[in-house]
Amino acid sequence: MEQTQKLKLNLQHFASNNVKPQVFNPDNVMMHEKKDGTLMNEFTTPILQEVMENSKIMQLGKYEPMEGTEKKFTFWADKPGAYWVGEGQKIETSKATWVNATMRAFKLGVILPVTKEFLNYTYSQFFEEMKPMIAEAFYKKFDEAGILNQGNNPFGKSIAQSIEKTNKVIKGDFTQDNIIDLEALLEDDELEANAFISKTQNRSLLRKIVDPETKERIYDRNSDSLDGLPVVNLKSSNLKRGELITGDFDKLIYGIPQLIEYKIDETAQLSTVKNEDGTPVNLFEQDMVALRATMHVALHIADDKAFAKLVPADKRTDSVPGEV
């Protein structure tokens, strides 16, 4: 039996110092070649910037860096005070309260259906086109949960729930007295309002607020400020005309621990996205694809007493789940 001679190869002979690993270039790679993964920093950064510029929680709240999906806090509920001490006298022990709290991040997802032609876009073209839609979906969902306790809020806390706990509610119209009384609800607990959350439909009501003695208006439409404090407008049908929230927003804390991840699907039926006739969108049948993007966000409220709300006199403020 003849033995087969095996060719001995010197693999180093085929190696070349000039051969470099291929670098991912978003301008050359088509979306149908890269249907999932972690979004590149050059696209994540502008999306997060747009989210932070438009989210009312992120505009007004206090950012806390996070390295994981959970962060533990220790802070003063009642800060220690100082005492006058005479010569030879014993220094009194200050009464203070430490509070331990945990802020946990939850995954926030958005599904955006688009035509199949989008798969022929380059990675850069695709995410440049989708960037504003991704950002808007993220900040609207986060604000509705953290401010109004809407949309299956996973945090277990929100400004609406804090107001419900403390019953810091003023019922009435947009008048100077009611605005002062609203701010006073915080001052009673040695807190100070530093902003208002309103909506665009309230601007005509705000412009009508007049000091009865000086006849001056306390709303400045040029700077969008009320009683010297900034007013931000929340775009949500769940905040009604005639409702106004104020608070010490230093007590509202948020975090963003992870980058944005994405996946493109071509076959799913989207139960949460409807056609004009009310039927679910079927990607395969309708020759579409869907982008699913996810990010983690965290929220914590350090003091429930830091928020109050003005509502119309006939507005119900109890026994309505998820509403205040």
Swiss-Prot record:
Propeptide: 1-14
GO CC annotation terms, alphabetical: viral capsid
SUPFAM superfamilies hit by this protein: Major capsid protein gp5
Subcellular location, record wording: Virion
Post-translational events: The N-terminus is cleaved by ribosomal processing protease Prp.
Keywords, ordered alphabetically: Capsid protein, Late protein, Virion
Assembly with partners or alone: Forms homopentamers and homohexamers in the mature capsid forming a 63 nm icosahedral head with T=7 architecture. The procapsid is made up of hexamers and pentamers of this subunit. There are seven subunits in the asymmetric unit in the T=7 procapsid. Found in the procapsid with the scaffold protein in a 2:1 capsid protein:scaffold protein molecular ratio.
Task performed by this protein: Assembles to form an icosahedral capsid, as well as procapsid, with T=7 icosahedral symmetry.
Sequence similarity: Belongs to the HK97 phage major capsid protein family.
Protein name: Major capsid protein
